[in-house]
């Protein structure tokens, strides 16, 4: 069997294109990179944020790194054998020290990549997701009473999409989630429901304990390694979507391919959070 890395530039050595928070198609994306970088393969998304990192100056960060800061966020990259990306968000600044209402949009800070050649599920024997993360202990404004809709989630999503051109369901997709942290819980809970943030697509996220089987709670402040064949869970996600009435024009697994990935923070309340990421990988183990 052949193993193929699906991600381009998994160490982020070539930086990012950065889209503005609320009008990603209104102007060309900004360039966030460092000396000797080439054309970026990644997008940096900052949906619904109140500050735009596109306008911040690049600063040196330690002996081998660079950083970009706004009042509400910080992006930091450090070179090395295993380059490290850090994403910081200050929800107290993002929400002006107030509590977000449950129907209001929430701030994101994500990295995103469209795969150059989507890989069909039917061609896979395994799909191996791997990374190392270090999520710092979070803090909140102690004067504010957080509700259940106020949280910070550090997670990845992979789109499982119908890529059969000419098919009635072409382009329809499933969000498949890989949760690391949900600050409401010791470990993130399973989630299977339609997206309320705009896409309207089905989200299938197994629980944190499905991934981190040795932990009772997520170990904040420590490097945690994840290596997992996620293909069986993707199949379970498609089945759940069909049962829930989604993807009804695409009721055939052979239509679907791995299409894109994003990873980062979704911040729905006034929490201050930070996480580091290194050794990211998405490997297709192809059938013989």
Task: Annotate the PLM regions.
Residues 69-141:
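Short N-terminal edge-element motif at the start of the domain
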Residues 1-72:
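Extracellular carbohydrate-recognition regions
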Residues 8, 119-129, 148-152, 252-257:
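Solvent-exposed loop and beta-edge segments used for protein-protein assembly and interaction
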Residues 208-288:
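Long, compositionally biased interface segments
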Residues 126-128, 132-234:
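Short helix-loop boundary/capping segments
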Residues 106-113, 154, 233-239:
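Well-ordered, non-membrane alpha-helical segments in soluble/globular domains
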Residues 1-3, 7-22, 48-49, 57, ...:
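Disulfide-rich extracellular domains of secreted proteins
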Residues 95-101, 140-148, 241-250:
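Low-complexity, polar-biased intrinsically disordered regions enriched in Pro/Ser/Thr/Gly
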């Amino acid at each position: 069997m052949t193993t193929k890395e699906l991600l381009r530039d998994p160490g982020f050595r070539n930086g990012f294109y950065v889209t503005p928070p609320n009008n990603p198609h209104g102007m060309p994306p900004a360039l966030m990179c460092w000396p000797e970088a080439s054309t970026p393969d990644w997008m940096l998304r900052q949906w619904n944020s109140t500050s735009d990192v596109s306008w911040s100056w690049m600063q040196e960060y330690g002996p081998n790194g660079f950083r970009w800061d706004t009042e509400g966020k910080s992006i930091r990259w450090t070179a090395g054998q295993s380059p490290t990306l850090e994403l910081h968000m200050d929800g107290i600044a993002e929400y002006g020290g107030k509590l977000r209402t449950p129907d209001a949009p929430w701030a994101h800070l994500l990295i995103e990549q469209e795969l150059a050649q989507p890989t069909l599920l039917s061609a896979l024997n395994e799909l191996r997701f791997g990374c190392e993360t270090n999520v710092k202990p979070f803090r909140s404004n102690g004067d504010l009473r957080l509700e259940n809709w106020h949280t910070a989630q550090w997670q990845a999503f992979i789109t499982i999409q119908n890529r059969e051109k000419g098919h009635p369901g072409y382009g329809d997709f499933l969000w498949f989630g890989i949760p690391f942290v949900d600050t409401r819980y010791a470990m993130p809970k399973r989630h299977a429901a339609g997206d309320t943030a705009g896409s309207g697509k089905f989200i299938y996220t197994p629980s944190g304990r499905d991934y981190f089987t040795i932990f009772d709670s997520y170990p904040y402040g420590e490097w945690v390694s994840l290596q997992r064949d996620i293909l069986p869970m993707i199949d379970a996600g498609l089945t759940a979507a069909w049962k829930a009435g989604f993807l009804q024009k695409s009721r055939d697994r052979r239509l679907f391919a791995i299409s894109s990935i994003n990873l980062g923070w979704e911040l729905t309340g006034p929490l201050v959070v930070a996480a580091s990421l290194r050794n990211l990988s998405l490997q297709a183990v192809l059938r013989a």
